[in-house]
């Protein structure tokens, strides 16, 4: 391989990607590290410097929290994306954004390749590589961890030999990924689907036994499907989600224990914490119920399921995803209003909703004297609505008589 070929590495600061810097150098590459802040709470300045210490020639630290919130989490919210009905797509949402930034840095640096730290067993390798190829088919994609196939002990030996710092949390049994939409946790005792997750597996949510005994009421304002304020206070979308993570998390909202079907064909037990996401998803759905006509409200879940599958399966940049985005955007035009939510003992309970575009007419719905519904019109409607069933019954009875 000729010298001075650049590769842009998605760098997390952990053992795998730190070792990958040195390993890629041994393959003849100059390594440019790319560190993204998508709301995981890490000290990104420290991670940026660590990349340089372990041998990267350049280290980018990109604050992508607001872009992640506006372009990725908001789509997940408006599409109510819950993979297999339970998983709000925490990690799956950040991967296309990370891929996008890797490609942008690679093009800026005239790199010939990008690299990630995924193993050959998970979903993320697919999400990264499919996204990268969709954005720039000319870039080579390298997967050092998948290629070297070392055991943990062999990796540690390599790190010590090359003076690479060993993370202090290396003994943790868990594999954790976090962004502002939530936190995922796997491995260790969680690999046993019968074992109850220990409290040490959680970080964003309070155990139910320790949550406040008094509920907290909040009001969330939406404008065209986008949450903009809590209790009348305006927030950027990223700050709003992070604030809700804290508020709802204190009440134990958003714990999810799920055995899911991975893209690569295996089942995996995952524990998720998504206090802000779960609260927003419930509030947004209730506002849609108030403002969408029945036909749209009944059809939209079909789109939502497909959208969740596309995102989970790494097809964010696919043509179908783009087409579904257009439908989704159209459905949000009147999803404006305020939703009142009670947070209590692990639950986010919607207790009220209002909108200038509300399709709920109290005078039509009421059973009091104010009722304006035309009851006489019901007779003709029922006759026409049931006509096909009635005709079918008449015809079949005639045939039975002939027999």
Swiss-Prot record:
Pathway recorded for this protein: Amino-acid biosynthesis; L-arginine biosynthesis; L-arginine from L-ornithine and carbamoyl phosphate: step 2/3
Keywords: Amino-acid biosynthesis, Arginine biosynthesis, ATP-binding, Cytoplasm, Ligase, Nucleotide-binding
Top EC class of this enzyme: ligase
Keyword ATP-binding attached: yes
Residue sites binding L-aspartate per the record: 119, 123-124
GO MF annotation terms: argininosuccinate synthase activity; ATP binding
Disulfide bond residue pairs: none
Annotated binding of ATP, by residue: 10-18, 117
Organism superkingdom: Bacteria
InterPro entries attached to this UniProt entry: Arginosuc_syn_C, Arginosuc_syn_N, Arginosuc_synth, Arginosuc_synth_CS, Arginosuc_synth_type_1_subfam, AS_cat/multimer_dom_body, Rossmann-like_a/b/a_fold
Protein name: Argininosuccinate synthase
GO term, biological process aspect, one: L-arginine biosynthetic process
Binding site for L-citrulline: 87, 123, 127, 175, 184, 260, 272
Subunit comment: Homotetramer.
Catalytic activity: L-citrulline + L-aspartate + ATP = 2-(N(omega)-L-arginino)succinate + AMP + diphosphate + H(+)
Phylogenetic classification of the source organism: Bacteria, Bacillati, Bacillota, Bacilli, Bacillales
Compartments it resides in: Cytoplasm
GO cellular component: a single term: cytoplasm
Similarity comment text for this entry: Belongs to the argininosuccinate synthase family. Type 1 subfamily.
EC number: 6.3.4.5
């Amino acid at each position: 391989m000729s010298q001075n070929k650049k590769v842009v590495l998605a760098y997390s600061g952990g053992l795998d990607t730190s070792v990958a810097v040195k390993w890629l150098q041994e393959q003849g590459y100059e390594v440019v590290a790319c560190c993204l802040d998508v709301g995981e709470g890490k000290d990104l300045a420290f991670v940026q410097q660590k990349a340089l210490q372990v041998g990267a020639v350049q280290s980018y630290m990109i604050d992508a929290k607001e872009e992640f919130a506006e372009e990725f989490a908001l789509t997940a919210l408006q599409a109510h994306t819950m993979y297999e009905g339970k998983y709000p797509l925490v990690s799956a949402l950040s991967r296309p954004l990370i891929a996008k930034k890797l490609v942008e840095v690679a093009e800026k640096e005239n790199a010939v390749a990008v690299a990630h730290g995924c193993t050959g067993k998970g979903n993320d390798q697919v999400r990264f590589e499919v996204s990268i190829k969709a954005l720039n088919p000319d870039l080579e994609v390298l997967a050092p961890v998948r290629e070297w196939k070392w055991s943990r002990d062999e990796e540690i030996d390599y790190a010590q030999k090359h003076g690479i710092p060993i993370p202090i949390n290396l003994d943790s049994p868990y594999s954790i990924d976090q962004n502002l939409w939530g936190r995922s946790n796997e491995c260790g005792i969680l690999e046993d689907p019968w074992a109850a997750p220990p409290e040490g597996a959680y970080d964003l949510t309070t155990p139910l036994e320790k949550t406040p005994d008094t509920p907290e009421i909040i009001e969330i304002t939406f404008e065209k499907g986008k949450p903009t304020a809590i209790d009348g206070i305006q927030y950027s979308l990223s700050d709003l989600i992070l604030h809700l993570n804290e508020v709802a998390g204190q009440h134990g909202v958003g714990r999810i224990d799920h055995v899911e079907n991975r893209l690569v064909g295996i089942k995996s037990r995952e524990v998720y914490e998504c206090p802000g996401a779960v609260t927003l998803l419930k509030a947004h759905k209730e506002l849609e119920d108030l403002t969408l006509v029945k036909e749209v409200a009944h059809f939209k879940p079909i789109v939502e399921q497909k959208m969740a599958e596309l995102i989970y399966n790494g097809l964010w940049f696919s043509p179908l995803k783009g087409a579904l985005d257009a439908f989704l955007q159209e459905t949000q035009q009147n999803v404006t209003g305020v939703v009142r939510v009670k947070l209590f003992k692990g639950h986010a309970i919607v207790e009220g909703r209002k909108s200038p575009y509300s399709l709920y007419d109290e005078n039509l719905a009421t059973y009091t004297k104010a009722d304006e519904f035309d009851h006489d019109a019901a007779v003709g409607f029922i006759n026409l609505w049931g006509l096909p069933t009635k005709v079918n019954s008449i015809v079949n009875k005639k045939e039975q008589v002939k027999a």
